[in-house]
């Protein structure tokens, strides 16, 4: 049974599955993704300032890191479900290391202090997800509700952070909706693990992956517009 749980994550994380199975994606997400790609390309052609290679490198970096975010958290959820404390401890450290890497990506743009603030916010996001996972396993609905409230307030905080550092290109509520939907995906996955809905889990993964790609692309586009000199 443990191998079946773990296999969901490993198969989902393989390049073959990642590239070959797109799953069911919300139409709005598809539209947004194409809009973001078009926007970056248009600015490069029109302004002549943005180097598409450097933008693509940043996009790949952020996509890989956000993919790592959902992959490592999935394993925390798995090990919570199977009550494997040793593996859960390792996975927990991996989640936080990944959050630090995401935050550090923004250090050249916003400085060390703001990078540390972002790390705190991402860690808080994870704490809410972990709380919901543990509450779901224990059947504690009151704790589940508290975790959902925590996720929602954290989405507001992450949105406020990015609006604060990049108000022109990430205005209020731009990031909040993306992070809120991302949190809902974690919740969905946790409940599917709890119910042992393996087929649904494999459908959920491509949706989660595509959504974190949209988060990464949104941040990449905003950075390239705010700091064209760093992408020239």
Predicted regions span which residues?
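Intrinsic-disorder-associated, low-complexity terminal segments enriched in Asp/Asn/His/Tyr and depleted
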Residues: 3-4
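Bacterial N-terminal signal peptides
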Residues: 30-38
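Bacterial Sec-dependent signal peptides at the C-terminal "C-region" and cleavage site
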Residues: 39-49
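Surface-exposed extracytoplasmic segments
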Residues: 63, 181, 185-188, 205-206, ...
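Alpha-helical segments in soluble extracytoplasmic regions
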Residues: 73-163, 211
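A cross-kingdom marker for long, charged
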Residues: 204-232
